[in-house]
A protein has these predicted regions:
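Shared catalytic-loop signature of beta/alpha-barrel
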Residues: 56, 62, 73-174
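Metal-dependent enolase-superfamily TIM-barrel catalytic cores that perform enediolate-based chemistry
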Residues: 1-80, 84-85
Length: 174
């Protein structure tokens, strides 16, 4: 979901939680219940209670996950948010090592980890993150929108990971 158009990921901003909930509802109405709907909010909320308040407003829209709801260093907040909402929490695109990913899975209690093959140390390190996530019952949705090579690497990574239902990428044009 892109809050501000025309469908440019770089313009994503949430000015009002009610507007966010309305956008989620309108997207759900547009695509129907059969379509998987995810929302990347680009670290929109500064604390878990604010994120929870907004997510509670759109709970019935059945988001598959909410991506990057809080600053990546707020693992305690991610943990509390993950425990308090039905929507899966997802993060990891900015993490630099497998160890940061492991810590985010454990301390952040995330439902979906999103390693970026180009940032986390390549395919081998990303695969280690995937294996760890699978062992912990965490889904993997690799983050990638830099290049065709990165998308190909993420696609190959996802093919080796049972817990990987999707990859994230940003096409040149929407």
């Amino acid at each position: 979901i892109c809050i501000k158009g025309p469908y440019s990921h770089n313009n994503l901003q949430i000015d009002d939680d009610r507007e966010f909930a309305k956008m989620v509802r309108l997207c759900r109405e547009a695509v129907g219940d059969e379509m998987t709907l995810m929302a990347d909010v680009a670290y929109a909320w500064q604390d878990w209670k604010s994120a929870k308040r907004a997510l509670d407003m759109c709970e019935k829209e059945n988001l598959f996950f909410i991506e990057t709801p809080l600053p990546i260093e707020d693992l305690e907040g991610l943990n509390k948010l993950s425990q308090s909402v039905q929507t899966r929490t997802a993060t990891g695109e900015m993490l630099q090592t497998r160890y940061e990913c492991f810590e985010t899975i454990i301390r952040g209690n995330v439902d979906v980890i999103q390693p970026d093959v180009g940032r986390v140390g390549g395919l081998t390190e990303a695969k280690r993150v995937c294996d760890f996530a699978e062992d912990k019952g965490v889904l993997v949705v690799p983050h990638c929108w830099k290049s065709a090579i990165g998308i190909a690497a993420s696609t190959h990574l996802s093919a080796t990971t049972l817990a990987c239902p999707y990859i994230e990428f940003l096409p040149n044009e929407l």
